[in-house]
Amino acid sequence: MAPQAYPTAGQTTTVCVTGAAGFMASWLVKRLLEKGYIVHATVRDPENKAKVSHLLNLPGATDRLKLFRAELCEDGSFDAAVAGCNGVFHVATPTEFMPKDPENDLIKPAIEGTLNVLKSCTKVDSIKRVVVTSSAATVSINNSSEQNQYIDESCWTDVNFLTSQKPPGWAYPVSKTLAEQAALKYAEEHSLDVVTVIPVLVVGPAVTPTVPSSVELALSLITGDEFKMGALKGMQFVSGSISLVHIDDVCSAQIFLMEKPSAQGRYICFPVNTGIPQLAEFLSKRYPQYKVPTKFDDVPATPKLTISSQKLLDCGFSFKYGIEDIYDQAIEYMKTKGLLTC
């Protein structure tokens, strides 16, 4: 491959975003358009206006956004979308957390889909870098009972533990871990510049027509949604902590890493690492109008690990939103959706 300069914002720079109709990817498209990029966005059905109108209505979309049909597990499906691009943001991923057939419904599609995107990218000389969105589920899950664990980009989730013990939701972290490992291996074998971004619970406003499940999850202590609260507890039980990042920060980090020539490898991306008891105490004090539970007998009193974003910070990135901003904006967003009233 003989790519040119690293992508930079401007009306002559074209990038592709996969899975563009989703929560994170649609916000990423929004931010890229704001910065002046030309955006090729992949969706499953460009003609389904109910699923893509939020993209077409973004400022700048009329002149600088083009939708492409693509399917993760269809060979060559991303060829047209990445053609002529300078960079690619691979965000698309299967998100069925409780699949009936984990191997065929979630794990294989995640791996094959990622490789299909990368194979398309190797056909295009102008592509300088691919930024792959991974997950903290790829670094934080293990069978250790050790407290105060320090997690950084050198850590990998224990896939053998997950596949043997099968805790609730086990297939998703397995799919993300194996997909990221496959991406990095493919990149090395084919001299493709791939950087991975590792966020966790992404929270904030959305341009999607429906409320993102991660926002509902993060706000379950406020809304009282027992099912979502149970899932939040399960997250801490399996991964060891609750970590949060604002949607705008993670998208800014993706763009930052696309544009940063020296970026390489994996980057954990979130500023807030806590546990449910600590999070509940914060929420009850900051938002006393809501009945936030503060007594928990079924979750650890403190998180067993700390996940570090130091590598990203050392690269020159800075987070704009702390926990107060994350929840202030998420609550206001839920009010606009009529899901919170005070």
Curated annotation (Swiss-Prot):
Chain sites annotated for binding NADP(+): R44, K51, E71, L72, V91, A92, T93, Y172, K176, P199, V200, L201, V202, S214
Keywords carried by this UniProt record: Flavonoid biosynthesis, NADP, Oxidoreductase
InterPro entries hit by this protein: Epimerase_deHydtase, NAD(P)-bd_dom_sf, NAD(P)_dehydrat-like
Entry annotated with the keyword Transferase: no
Pathway(s) it belongs to: Secondary metabolite biosynthesis; flavonoid biosynthesis
Enzyme class at the top of the EC tree: oxidoreductase
Keyword Repeat: no
Biological process terms in GO annotation: flavonoid biosynthetic process
Tissue expression: Highly expressed in leaves and weakly in stems. Not expressed in roots.
EC number: 1.3.1.-
Pfam families per UniProt: Epimerase (PF01370)
UniProt signal peptide: none
Coiled coil: none
Active site residues per record: K176
Domain of life: Eukaryota
MF terms (GO), sorted A to Z: oxidoreductase activity, acting on the CH-OH group of donors, NAD or NADP as acceptor
Family classification: Belongs to the NAD(P)-dependent epimerase/dehydratase family. Dihydroflavonol-4-reductase subfamily.
Protein name: Putative anthocyanidin reductase
Organism per entry: Ginkgo biloba
